């Protein structure tokens, strides 16, 4: 039985006219090859004037979603840069004053880096533009934006190889017009663990408030924010003094749980058990990660005899410290019915402060971690994750400071590498560059990476400029640092107007008991409420360094989330619409009245490839696309019609149609009067090459149909 679909799709061409070829580039993905050759369709490789290159097609160690890449082994260079190059043979139209962004993936072998020049040039004299890119040993996407000075119908993109003795790899090329954001769901990265914050401080202040006000604050923090992570103190005085002299026999009755209990008559009470259980009962989706963090071991275990002012663990007290942490886990479960899922034995060991702290070196911390990991297994807590080191900084030139430097040192020991389940950091340095995030990712050796505490400490502001502190760390951290989770320092705290110092918490109240919601609260909703645990980051490409972009898809492929933050105002921004999108929701937070507001006035045509919008300065935008998988994956026939490339148009002697799918097709051509001038069936292929010399100079339309058994 044959099923067939008939689709009318009209193109017009007028012969003996200059070509006006439109983007996108033909075979930009470098997937289609010429039959019987080792060359990509619409691409050519040159070696002239002494240049010598071994050109081939690579099929291994590619980026996700790719099956082929251009491989160029450079033996020697020519006398000029253009003598050794790969160029697109698809000549396309450009317009004066328009911006065109070139994106491509590349890597090199044979050296740790090499230079590749990206070139834009047409037949117009003086049209040459080139930009050098430093390519390293790992696949990476590069981009450059060209502004064209002259109109042309014959613009060409080429890649010049500028170093010999290395092998270049090139793949997934793209040229986009204007301000375009592209998505690639086939390229996936890390899986999200979640979003949250801490209650390490201020719980006693919250529980001093009237019950109705406290309930409002907790509802805002734990219900309206759809977080799934919470972090709290392991207090140093839980075991002070020593329970006994045997670190392997815990005396639970000697532990002091005052800080975790709810006793308003005791100044040391912190209501931790009640605060945690209230959070759990309010949560819509539940908490996947419940994290105990210890600033300092009990004073009697430390070199300075105090839980404050740094110091470190006395050598040989690792067993006692592990017993202390096991006692905490056991008591939280038995007393408060709370099963802690992750534990961290240090907080900012690289930061010297006067409050609760412990300045352990990487070597000292390594001993603690190995001992703790073994003890967790021995005591039946192997399911509890070990988090470390939670340094104050992501990266630093000082080798004794930062999470990156700690991890680089600690992971030299395979026992520490095995002991640590999650690499955790705080990003309190003034700024974190993309390279510093990448350094942390490399050092972490593919372990999950969490920001477990972050806040714009000391900022008196609650506007979008303050919120941008977190936006930049979240987007850059996930995009470049491999982050899988991000947590604020505190869920709630009182705002100190008198001293002009704001809290860095998510939910605030002032001295008059008025609740304040800073812009960072609404910005965090763009992530915590829209991007869930188990979602995957997907590849996204932008056009402007002032525009932060990140994208995710749900585990069942039913949603695609795109988050954007614009520092300056941008007009006519084009966002690629994912295949199979059947609806889109648009949320905005800005310095205006938009607070995670759902925009209902947008009119987007989801049948188009892109949707256009304007972005105001200092505004956060999130787009939630609902995907019908039957349209994006099963209905390939519909996609086939939307992915056709016609080249050249107008045509003189030959016309080529490239399709997404290889199918048997029947092509019918009509003249301007609607009379049939050609009807022909073509064998299964993703390309039709039509000799047009038999046609008179005129405009024509055509239709085609395909079928499958």
Task: Show which residues each predicted segment covers.
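Carbohydrate-binding surface patches
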Residues: 543-582, 618
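Glycoside hydrolase catalytic-domain groove-lining segments
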Residues: 267-269, 418-459
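Active-site cleft segment of glycoside hydrolase catalytic domains centered on the general acid/base Glu
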Residues: 272, 300-413, 431-438, 442
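Extracellular and organelle-lumenal recognition/adhesion modules and their flexible linkers in secreted
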Residues: 20-180, 555-557, 568
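C-terminal beta-strand-rich structural cap/linker in extracellular carbohydrate-active enzymes
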Residues: 602-630
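C-terminal outer-membrane/trafficking sorting elements
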Residues: 636-709
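N-terminal catalytic cores of secreted or lumenal carbohydrate-active enzymes
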Residues: 181-341, 361-366, 370, 374
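Aromatic/acidic polysaccharide-binding cleft in carbohydrate-active enzymes
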Residues: 448-525, 538-543
């Amino acid at each position: 039985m044959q099923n067939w679909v008939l689709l009318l799709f009209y193109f017009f061409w007028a012969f003996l006219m200059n070509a006006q070829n439109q983007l996108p580039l033909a075979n930009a993905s470098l997937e289609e090859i010429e039959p019987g050759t080792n060359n990509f369709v619409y691409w050519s490789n040159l070696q002239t004037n002494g240049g010598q290159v071994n050109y081939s097609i690579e099929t291994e160690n590619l980026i996700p979603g790719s099956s082929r890449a251009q491989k160029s082994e450079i033996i020697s260079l020519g006398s000029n840069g253009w003598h050794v190059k790969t160029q697109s043979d698809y000549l396309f139209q450009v317009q004066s004053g328009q911006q065109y962004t070139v994106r491509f993936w590349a890597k090199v072998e044979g050296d740790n880096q090499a230079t590749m020049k990206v070139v834009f040039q047409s037949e117009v004299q003086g049209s040459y533009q080139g930009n050098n890119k430093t390519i390293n040993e790992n696949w990476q996407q590069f981009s450059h934006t060209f502004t064209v000075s002259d109109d042309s119908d014959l613009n060409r993109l080429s890649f010049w190889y500028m170093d010999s003795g290395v092998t270049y790899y090139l793949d997934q090329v793209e040229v986009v017009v204007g301000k375009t954001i592209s998505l690639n769901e086939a390229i996936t990265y890390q899986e999200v663990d979640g979003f949250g914050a801490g209650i390490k401080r201020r719980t006693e202040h919250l529980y001093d408030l009237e019950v109705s006000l406290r309930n409002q604050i907790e509802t805002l923090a734990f219900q309206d924010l759809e977080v799934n992570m919470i972090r709290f103190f392991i207090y140093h005085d839980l075991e002070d003094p020593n329970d006994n002299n045997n670190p392997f026999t815990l005396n639970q009755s000697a532990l002091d749980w005052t800080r975790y209990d709810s006793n308003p008559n005791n100044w040391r009470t912190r209501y931790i058990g009640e605060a945690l259980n209230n959070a759990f009962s309010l949560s819509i989706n539940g908490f996947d990660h419940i994290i105990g963090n210890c600033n300092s071991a009990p004073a009697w275990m430390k070199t300075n005899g105090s839980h404050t002012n740094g110091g470190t663990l006395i050598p040989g007290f690792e067993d006692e410290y592990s017993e202390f942490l096991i006692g905490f886990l056991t008591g939280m479960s038995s007393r408060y019915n709370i099963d802690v899922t992750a534990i961290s034995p240090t907080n900012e060991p690289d930061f010297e402060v006067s409050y609760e702290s412990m300045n352990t070196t990487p070597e000292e911390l390594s001993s603690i971690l190995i001992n703790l990991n073994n003890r967790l297994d021995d005591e039946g807590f192997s399911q509890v994750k070990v988090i470390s080191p939670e340094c104050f900084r992501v990266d630093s030139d000082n080798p004794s400071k930062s999470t990156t430097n700690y991890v680089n040192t600690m992971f030299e020991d395979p026992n520490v590498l095995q002991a640590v389940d999650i690499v955790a950091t705080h990003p309190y340095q003034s700024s974190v560059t993309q390279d510093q995030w990448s350094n942390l990712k490399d050092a972490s050796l593919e372990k999950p990476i969490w920001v477990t505490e972050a806040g714009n400490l000391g900022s008196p502001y609650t506007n979008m400029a303050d919120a941008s502190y977190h936006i930049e760390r979240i987007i850059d951290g996930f995009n470049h640092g491999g982050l899988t989770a991000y947590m604020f320092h505190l869920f709630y705290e009182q705002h100190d107007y008198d001293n002009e110092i704001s809290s860095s918490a998510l939910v605030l109240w002032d001295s008059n008991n008025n609740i304040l919601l800073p812009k960072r609260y609404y910005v965090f909703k763009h992530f915590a409420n829209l991007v869930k645990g188990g979602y995957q980051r997907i590849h996204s490409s932008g056009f402007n360094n002032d525009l932060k972009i990140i994208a995710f898809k749900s585990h069942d492929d039913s949603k695609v989330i795109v988050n954007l933050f614009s520092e300056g105002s941008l007009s006519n921004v084009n966002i690629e619409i994912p295949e199979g999108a059947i609806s889109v929701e648009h949320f905005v937070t800005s310095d205006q009245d938009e607070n995670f507001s759902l925009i209902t006035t947008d009119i987007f045509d989801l049948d188009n490839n892109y949707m256009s919008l304007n972005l105001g300065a200092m505004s956060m935008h999130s787009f939630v696309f609902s995907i019908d998988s039957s349209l994006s994956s099963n209905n390939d026939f519909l996609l086939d019609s939307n992915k056709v490339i016609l080249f050249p148009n107008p045509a003189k002697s030959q016309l080529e149609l490239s399709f997404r799918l290889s199918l048997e097709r029947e092509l019918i051509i009509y003249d301007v009067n609607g009379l049939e001038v050609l009807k022909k069936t073509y064998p299964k292929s993703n390309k039709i090459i039509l000799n047009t010399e038999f046609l008179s100079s005129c405009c024509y339309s055509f239709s085609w149909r395909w079928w499958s058994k």
